[in-house]
C-alpha cells in the first residue's frame, strides 16, 4: 500500500464514517443553488453540477462494492486522480464585491461554466497554485483584483508554481499568500499568523497580513 493510496483511502473512510455517524440533516449543494447566509451576503454554487455529483456518488459506490482487489486499487487510483475536480465552487457576493472560491479545482474543473460567471474581485486560486491550477484564459475571464494562493513556503507538490504566479501578476492582480513563498518578483511576504481581507461597500477590499505576536 503506497503512502498516496493509504492517505486517500483513509480520507474516504473518515468521510464515510462521518456521514454514517451523523444524525443531523445533510445538504448537498449543487450548481445553480443560491444561499443567503446573512444580510448582504449571497453565496452562489457554481459547481459541481448535478451530473458531476451523481458521477462522483456512482464512483464511490462502485469502489466500496468492488470485491476484486486489483480492480479496487484501480478504481481508487482513478477516483484519486479525478477527485479535485469534484470540488465545491462557490461565488460569494457582498455589497458589490465578488469572491471566487474553487476549492481544490484545477483548470479542468471549470468545464461548462460560462466565463462571465467566473468574474471576481478576489480569487483563491485552486490546487494550491500548482501549474495546472488555472489557465490564462480563465484568469482573463475572472479578472481578479487580488489573488490568494494557499501554498507552503517549501512548495511541496510544486505548489505556488512560479509560472502561474507570474501569469496572475501580469494580469494586474495583487498576490497574497497564506504562507511565505517568494512571489514572481522575488519578494517574500512578511511572517504572519493569518491573512485577512476586509470587504466593504462599492468594491472596497483590503488584504492584511496579521503579524506574529512577540
Each language-model region and where it sits:
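Flexible, acidic/histidine-containing loops and adjacent segments that form or flank the divalent-metal
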Residues: 1-100, 173-174, 178-181, 185-214
Amino acid at each position: 500500500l503506497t503512502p498516496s493510496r493509504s492517505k486517500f483511502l483513509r480520507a474516504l473512510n473518515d468521510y464515510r464514517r462521518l456521514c454514517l455517524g451523523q444524525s443531523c440533516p445533510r445538504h448537498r449543494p449543487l450548481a445553480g443553488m443560491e444561499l443567503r447566509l446573512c444580510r448582504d451576503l449571497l453565496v452562489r454554487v457554481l459547481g459541481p453540477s448535478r451530473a458531476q455529483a451523481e458521477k462522483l456518488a456512482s464512483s464511490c459506490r462502485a469502489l466500496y462494492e468492488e470485491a476484486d482487489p486489483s480492480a479496487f486499487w484501480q478504481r481508487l487510483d482513478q477516483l484519486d486522480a479525478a477527485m479535485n475536480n469534484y470540488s465545491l465552487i462557490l461565488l460569494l457576493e457582498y455589497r458589490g464585491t465578488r469572491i471566487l472560491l474553487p476549492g481544490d479545482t484545477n483548470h479542468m474543473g471549470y468545464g461548462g461554466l460560462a466565463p462571465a460567471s467566473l468574474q471576481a474581485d478576489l480569487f483563491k486560486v485552486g490546487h494550491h497554485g500548482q501549474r495546472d491550477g488555472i489557465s490564462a484564459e480563465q484568469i482573463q475571464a475572472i479578472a481578479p483584483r487580488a489573488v490568494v494562493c494557499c501554498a507552503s513556503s517549501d512548495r511541496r507538490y510544486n505548489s505556488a508554481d512560479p509560472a502561474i504566479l507570474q501569469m496572475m501578476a501580469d494580469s494586474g492582480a495583487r498576490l497574497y499568500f497564506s504562507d511565505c513563498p517568494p512571489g514572481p518578483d522575488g519578494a517574500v511576504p512578511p511572517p504572519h499568523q493569518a491573512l485577512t481581507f476586509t470587504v466593504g461597500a462599492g468594491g472596497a477590499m483590503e488584504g492584511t497580513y496579521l503579524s506574529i505576536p512577540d
